[in-house]
A protein has these predicted regions:
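Zinc-dependent deaminase catalytic domain
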Residues: 7, 15-189
Length: 189
């Protein structure tokens, strides 16, 4: 419905508002998370699967075109019961000879898929043993949140090997402090 008045075109107000509403509905959200935040979030969610009472670490491996290839978390090897092995950090028998780190689990969980050129997201900077698996598998970038053990021999060796092998590592900085997952169905809100 258009009205002509002295050679000008006037559109009734209700039609203008309807058009404006349609335009606003067709605009994308501005508060979405980045790819890096998304994949680090997946790694953090994977960490929630760890049975380790002290340290929960998750990892996520992503292809060059941002497709998740694999995830992993720190835990006992497949077939080894979480209830039959130690979780202690100090003492006569500790978890250290048994636990598979998140990064290694993510590489192994890829089940032979090509990881060349991929990115790995992990909460804690990889140790020297995980760095070897990362390098050998062809991962080319590592994003991490914490470098808690930066001065340890294992971390220093890890950084040295990754630099020599051309694996880029970057501490992920984000304004996000947390992401909340809501499992309540819409009809129950």
């Amino acid at each position: 419905m258009t009205f002509f008045f002295w050679g000008l075109v006037y559109v009734p107000l209700f039609m203008y508002n309807e058009k404006k509403c349609r335009e606003e509905q067709n605009m994308k959200r501005e508060d979405y998370i980045s790819w890096d935040e998304y994949f680090m979030g997946i790694a953090m969610l994977a960490a929630r699967r760890s049975k380790d009472p002290n340290t929960q670490v998750g990892a996520c491996i992503v292809s060059q075109d941002n497709i998740i290839i694999s995830t992993g978390y720190n835990g006992m090897p497949k077939g080894c019961s979480d209830d039959e092995y130690p979780w202690e950090r100090i003492g006569e028998e500790t978890k250290y000879p048994y636990v598979v780190h998140a990064e290694l689990n993510a590489v192994l969980n890829a089940n032979g898929r090509d990881l060349r050129g991929s990115k790995l997201y992990v909460a804690l900077f990889p140790c020297n043993e995980c760095a070897k698996a990362i390098i050998q598998s062809g991962v080319k970038e590592v994003y991490y949140l914490s470098d808690k053990y930066a001065d340890s021999m294992a971390t220093l060796a890890s950084k040295r090997m990754m630099m020599s092998a051309g694996v880029k590592f970057t501490q992920l900085r984000t304004s996000l402090q947390s992401i909340t997952l809501d499992f309540v169905p819409e009809e129950e809100k």
